[in-house]
Amino acid sequence: MKAILLVLLCAFAATNADTLCIGYHANNSTDTVDTVLEKNVTVTHSVNLLEDRHNGKLCKLGGIAPLHLGKCNIAGWLLGNPECELLLTVSSWSYIVETSNSDNGTCYPGDFINYEELREQLSSVSSFERFEIFPKTSSWPNHETNRGVTAACPYAGANSFYRNLIWLVKKESSYPKLSKSYVNNKGKEVLVLWGIHHPPTSTDQQSLYQNADAYVFVGSSKYNRKFKPEIAARPKVRGQAGRMNYYWTLIEPGDTITFEATGNLVVPRYAFAMNRGSGSGIIISDAPVHDCNTKCQTPKGAINTSLPFQNIHPVTIGECPKYVKSTKLRMATGLRNIPSIQSRGLFGAIAGFIEGGWTGMIDGWYGYHHQNGQGSGYAADQKSTQNAIDGITNKVNSVIEKMNMQFTAVGKEFNNLEKRIENLNKKVDDGFLDVWTYNAELLVLLENERTLDFHDSNVKNLYEKVRSQLRNNAKEIGNGCFEFYHKCDDTCMESVKNGTYDYPKYSEESKLNREEIDGVKLESTRVYQILAIYSTVASSLVLLVSLGAISFWMCSNGSLQCRICI
């Protein structure tokens, strides 16, 4: 009876002891992140670094509308294709849009020389001044300026020609040598375009230019070239057996360009004084134009985001996130989200010694749960929580700032004869994308690992802070909790939390209670030992008596014969 009472007293004392536990926050978040060692780790808080949404619209960029070429392309717009006449008055834009069916380009068949390079030059131009470089009415008095029209470039049902060029032909029966120069006094680069006509027969050559052995020379300080017409029969394209090649050059401020010819020259009428600006570009898109504004435009739609990465489209214009191939880039800011299992108690393992988080603690990441004679409750440790928030916020901002390199990434243009270069370029671009994607994913994996380890370390530090104060005034239960050897009211609990716990004040009471509990345990252990001895002896006696009774019964009924020899 004494042993039973001692055991009950010990259990009752343990049940009513004041306790203080260290724990961490948990919530109903389903956010998951990946680390170097784990995938799909559920965390309490995280931030997304990857933008995957767009509005499906072509918007103004920085308040400036794009130039939508409609059914025209760059060549048709700059040459002045009659089908592109509505574009002639446009002088500024944020970016240029071609569509998948922008077919109105060079109406008279021929090659546009270095067309891809011209597109590249225009990708950095945000406006230009279209001006008459050689006035039609006064520049060519000895040549015909109105007969140079063709059925290949119709307008309103009649033969016509490019609005920015003049097709000079002989006047009456003469095509005298022409020489005309322009000095660039615009203070900026001037884009000049011209053409060279190649008739199909010598008869056409004489009919148009009179001179059988004609030539064209175009020269500036950086451009010098002499052209000879290539007279040859060719298959008809758009009803034309002849061909017309188109050329361009940029004239620097103060430089002079000179045209000299005895035939076959398509002279410039209008030129373009260009204003270069960052953020412009050319995209191919069938998305509709809307009255909206954005800082980043892709062919699929506008992106309004401050995130450092996007997986929408590799071609971007404006202040845009870096394109990566990733489908998920989420950075942990909070802790592992492991709500405690109620059937196993309130506490339990982060950092190896706490099994689950507390959904009841909502005002911090780390904190305490106490239980004493005055009740129980949660309290966050504001200092460690705030330090952690500041540190992680600074880290996230630093990562975003370093990776958030806003820039324009326009597509590159190659002609049909440059497929090898185009394929090589695609491989190089894909290689860069793979490297960027790998770097972004590795960065997030490493930072997530560090963040979760950082939280574990903070919980451990909080635990050690309490343990170093309590010393032997309390015992460690082993699940993140301490059981006091003395009464600890709310004031006492608060002193432990804020680091002002008075160890000497409670040490005497703790010593007495500790010795009493240890004595009870020792006495109960001795009683258990005595009971074990008594039980063993009693069991042995019962076994011997049973064996004797069985032997006597078997001897009496003859089943067992006993002989005693003297």
UniProtKB/Swiss-Prot annotation:
Key words, A-Z: Clathrin- and caveolin-independent endocytosis of virus by host, Clathrin-mediated endocytosis of virus by host, Disulfide bond, Fusion of virus membrane with host endosomal membrane, Fusion of virus membrane with host membrane, Glycoprotein, Hemagglutinin, Host cell membrane, Host membrane, Host-virus interaction, Lipoprotein, Membrane, Palmitate, Signal, Transmembrane, Transmembrane helix, Viral attachment to host cell, Viral envelope protein, Viral penetration into host cytoplasm, Virion, Virus endocytosis by host, Virus entry into host cell
Disulfide bonds: 21-481, 59-292, 72-84, 107-153, 296-320, 488-492
Name of one Pfam family that matches: Hemagglutinin
TM ranges: 530-550
Protein's recorded name: Hemagglutinin
Protein species of origin: Influenza A virus (strain A/Swine/Wisconsin/1/1961 H1N1)
UniProt subcellular location: Virion membrane; Host apical cell membrane
Gene name of the record: HA
Chief place of localization: virion
UniProt topological domain (Extracellular) ranges: 18-529
GO molecular function terms listed in the Swiss-Prot or TrEMBL record: host cell surface receptor binding
Protein modification: Palmitoylated.
GO biological process, one term: viral budding from plasma membrane
Alphabetical list of InterPro entries matching this protein: Capsid_hemagglutn, Hemagglutn_HA1_a/b_dom_sf, Hemagglutn_influenz_A, Hemagglutn_influenz_A/B
Record keyword Ribosomal protein present: no
Family affiliation: Belongs to the influenza viruses hemagglutinin family.
GO CC list: host cell plasma membrane; membrane; viral envelope; virion membrane
